[in-house]
Amino acid sequence: MALMAALNDPTPTGSVTGPVVGFDLDMTLIDSRPGIRATWAALAEQTGAHIDADLVVTRLGPPLEQEMAHWFPAERIPAMSELYREMYPTYAIEGTLPMPGVHETIAAVHAAGGRAVVVTAKYEPNAKLHLAHLGIAADAVVGNLWAEGKGEALREHGASVYVGDHTGDVRGARTAGALSVAVTTGPCDAAELRTAGADVILSDLTAFPAWLAGYVAQERA
C-alpha cells in the first residue's frame, strides 16, 4: 500500500541532485506480453469476437483503442476498451514479468540522485498495479499518453532522458526536448529506432546503469 501511495504522488519527497529519467512501461520496464495475451483471449471468449492475441502482443505500444479497431467496429470500441481495462487486473498482473535489469536501472537513477518517472500509454491504474506487484520503485507514474502526448508529462516532471522501446517513445522524447534512449526489447528494431531519431540505442536495460553513469559524469564535468 505504501508503494501505491507513493506512485500516486508526483511530487519529489526530497532534493533531486541527479537526472530525472522517464521510462515507458510495456516492453521497456516490464514484459507484459503473457498478461496482455491472456486478457485479450479472455475478452475474445467473453464477447465471441475473433481476436488473434498472439498477433496483438507483437505490436504493443500504441493506445488500446488503436488495437481495438482491428477487432471491433468503431461504435463498440469505447465499451470494449472499458471492459478490457476492467478485466485486465484479473488476467494480466500475475503473468507479467520484469525486464532484465529493471531493478538495477531504477536503483542507478536513484543512486545518481535522480528520479524515475514512468510515462505510458497504459491505463494509469493498471500501470501502477504492475509496478507495485513487481516492486519497481518509480517515483511517479503518468498514464494514458502516447507518442508526442508523452512530451507534456516529461516536461512537467523535468525529464532530461526518456527510455522506451517504440518509435512513439522517441517522438515523445523529442517533443519534450529530452535525450531519447531506446531499447530493442519491443516491436521496433535498432534501425527503426535510429531512423526515428533515437540518440542512444541499447540492447536492453542491463546496459543502462553503465550508460547512465557515463551520462551523469559528462553532465557534471
Would you name each region that the model predicts?
Residues 5-103, 112:
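N-terminal helical cap/lid subdomain that shapes the substrate entry/recognition surface
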Residues 55-56, 136-150:
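A short, structured active-site edge motif that brings together acidic residues
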Residues 59, 63, 97-101, 122-123, ...:
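Short beta->alpha linker loops
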Residues 102-131, 144:
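Substrate-recognition element of Asp-dependent hydrolases with the DxDx(T/V) motif
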Residues 108, 130-133, 153, 172-175, ...:
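Well-formed, non-transmembrane alpha-helical positions, independent of function
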Residues 113-117, 138-140, 158-160, 178-180, ...:
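Short active-site oxyanion
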Residues 120, 163-206:
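Acidic, Mg2+-coordinating phosphoryl-transfer loop and its flanking beta/alpha structural elements
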Residues 145-157, 167, 171:
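Short loop-to-alpha-helix "cap/lid" segments that border enzyme active sites
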